[in-house]
Each structure stands twice: as structure tokens, then as C-alpha cells.
Regions:
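Mature extracytoplasmic/periplasmic domains
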Residues: 263-326
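A structural signal for short loop-to-beta-strand junctions that line the ligand-binding cleft
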Residues: 74-79, 97-134, 150, 161
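Sec/Tat signal peptide C-region and signal peptidase I cleavage site
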Residues: 17-23
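Ligand-binding pocket segment of bilobal, Venus flytrap-like solute-binding proteins
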Residues: 166, 170-173, 177-251
């Protein structure tokens, strides 16, 4: 059973005109985003619109479980998740309400949102992006030996790689993207090669992998970009020292581009405040909110033509654009079942 931290949620909506009127001035949010800067976003939205945000925090899996358990009685209006595959699963489990929003459809690229329904409705939209990058010990590894995901399986990297659990959503999404690019047969061989190159059994989170590289426990790690940026911007000198010992590469610049995952949002299927929910998602795609995502949590905007000024992200990319993959992010979710089967066959935990 997943535990929830309830911050200000009305657990039941009573019948009656007064209650209905009051409900129209709130958005009940189920969020897997646990970032301090997001609180400022919610406050700004309330100041601008008068619509109060009542938030429940959990992880993606906990939100899905709660929505399923609550069914039509759910008070949720908006769902925020931090993984494309989980958003795809929520869509297929019929937990979200397809919507039409000219604002969202204009600014969020088609490959960073759900495929449209027959009537044009879209069930979820990416709101920020994060790259799955390769970190490496610059004193021991040449950048050209880790400049693609495929090279993680190269025998020359045997015994060098640290990675969190293969079944973690961030890795599942990467593996789903690689499968989409190279096909299931080659992806199976690749996964086996990556497993064979591990320096230790998978453990810990992404930051732990970066620190393991800095400590010499391994030479190569796979991580989301914002974890490295956090170390670079940390007020803790030890964190900065870790970042200074490690370099990152944005893989596959000469082929399909670096894999991007998303944090995204959807209107809950049984939303009692649909109009407010859509307004909130539109606000999260606005330049103001997109800049918060980039500068506050070291993510890249999902919306088009938003300028940001994050020194860590600039340093990571050498202040140049990087090539990212352009496959529909929904394709990553559709590959999850076969990816799990491939991991089982490889014994990659």
C-alpha cells in the first residue's frame, strides 16, 4: 500500500449547490513531482486565477493505485507524473480524460504528448524534459568510448558500469527507447551486454551512481541529467567535488539523439473541475512555469521557444543545443511489456 502525504485535500466532495460552487474554484492535484520550486508555481497560479491547489503527493505507482481504488469517487482533477511510460500506462488503464486545448497543442511538441484519440482529444502532455546521459570518470575513460548507448555494451567497458535497478522507470523508458530505435532482437543483445559490463549489482539512485564514479567504484554511470546538475549547483562542497571529478556525455549525437524522458500532466478521468484542470495544465506550459522547471529543478522546457538561464545546464551542454530523439514518447510506453520480458531473459534486475 502506498502512503500519501496529504497537504490540503478535501477527501470527499459533499452534494449540494454550495459545495459544487466551491469545488469550481479548486484543483485537486495528485502529484509525483516533489520539488520545492513547484510550490511557488502553484502559489503563482492561485494568485493569478483565484483557483486553489489542493495537493496529494505520492510516486507514480501510488497515484495509479489510488486512482484505480477510488474510481468514479476520486476527487482528483489533475495528475502529474515523472515518467512517460507511467503516463502511457495510465492512459491505457483509462485513468485520464482526453482534452482539447489549443494552447497546449500549440506549444507542446507532438512527440512529447499522447497520441490523439479519434475525436482529437489528448490524454496527457509533457511539461518538462530530462535527458538520460552517461557520466564517466574523465581520468579513466575517453568520451568517444561512451558517446552512444550502444557502447555501454562494448566489451571494452566490461566491469566499468554502475546503474540503478534495470526495472526502475527511468531505465525502463531508456530501454524502451533503444528498443524502438534498433529493434527487439538487437536490443536483447544490447541489454545482455550492458549487464555483462556492470561493475557491481544495480543499487541506489542516480546520484549514487555518479558518486560511485567519483569514488572509483566504477568508471561509467547512467543518470538523468538533472541529478548531475544538482551536484554542480549544490551548496555542499563535497557535492561540487563529485561533479568536478565526473564528466557527462549526451549520447547518440551522430545518430538518433539522446533519450528524453518527461514529467507530464493529465486531467483525471472523473475530474469534477475540468475547466480549472485544463487552465492549470495550460499554466504549467506557459513561459513562466516552463522557466521555473528549467531554473528550479534543472529540467528542460517541454514547450517550444522558451528561453532559460540555468548555469549548470549550460555547462553540461557547453552552452550549445544537443540533439534529442524525436520518436513519439508514447512509443516508449508501448514497449514496456517487451522490455520487461527482455530483462527477465537477460537476468538483468
Amino acid at each position: 500500500m502506498h502512503s500519501f502525504k496529504i497537504l490540503a485535500l478535501a477527501c470527499a466532495i459533499t452534494a449540494g449547490t454550495a459545495a459544487t460552487a466551491q469545488a469550481q474554484e479548486v484543483v485537486n492535484l495528485y502529484s509525483a513531482r516533489h520539488y520545492a520550486t513547484d510550490e511557488a508555481l502553484y502559489n503563482n497560479f492561485t494568485k493569478a486565477t483565484g483557483i486553489k491547489i489542493n495537493r496529494v503527493d505520492s510516486d507514480d505507482a501510488g497515484i495509479v493505485a489510488r486512482l484505480k481504488a477510488e474510481g468514479a469517487a476520486s476527487p482528483a482533477d489533475v495528475v502529474l507524473m515523472v515518467d512517460a511510460a507511467r503516463l502511457y500506462r495510465g492512459e491505457k488503464d483509462n485513468l485520464f480524460l482526453p482534452i482539447r486545448s489549443a494552447k497546449l497543442e500549440e506549444v507542446i511538441p507532438a512527440n512529447l504528448r499522447a497520441q490523439p484519440e479519434a475525436d482529437g482529444g489528448i490524454t496527457w502532455f509533457g511539461l518538462s524534459t530530462r535527458a538520460r546521459v552517461i557520466a564517466y570518470n574523465k581520468a579513466k575513460v575517453n568520451a568517444e568510448d561512451v558517446d552512444s548507448y550502444e557502447k555501454l555494451a562494448d566489451p571494452k567497458n566490461k566491469g566499468k558500469i554502475c546503474i540503478r535497478s534495470a526495472s526502475h522507470p527511468y531505465n525502463l523508458s531508456l530501454f524502451g527507447a533503444v528498443t524502438e530505435h534498433i529493434g527487439e532482437a538487437k536490443a536483447q543483445q544490447w541489454l545482455q551486454g550492458v549487464k555483462d559490463n556492470l561493475a557491481r549489482p544495480p543499487k541506489g539512485g542516480d546520484t549514487d551512481q555518479i558518486k560511485a564514479v567519483a569514488a572509483g567504484e566504477c568508471d561509467i554511470a547512467v543518470t538523468n541529467s538533472y541529478y548531475f546538475a544538482r551536484l554542480m549547483r549544490s551548496s555542499n562542497p563535497d557535492d561540487v567535488a563529485v561533479a568536478n571529478k565526473v564528466s557527462v556525455v549526451f549520447p547518440n549525437q551522430s545518430s538518433w539523439g539522446t533519450h528524453l524522458n518527461i514529467a507530464g500532466g493529465a486531467v483525471a478521468k472523473y475530474s469534477k473541475n475540468k475547466d480549472n484542470a485544463v487552465k492549470f495544465l495550460e499554466y504549467l506550459a506557459s513561459p513562466e512555469a516552463q522557466t521555473y522547471f528549467a531554473n528550479g529543478n534543472n529540467e528542460w522546457p517541454a514547450a517550444k521557444n522558451v528561453q532559460t538561464d540555468n548555469p549548470a545546464l549550460k555547462a553540461m551542454t557547453q552552452d550549445k543545443p544537443f540533439k534529442s530523439e524525436t520518436i513519439p514518447i508514447s512509443a516508449v510506453g508501448s514497449n514496456m511489456a517487451k522490455v520487461q520480458q527482455m530483462l527477465d531473459r537477460a537476468g538483468f534486475q
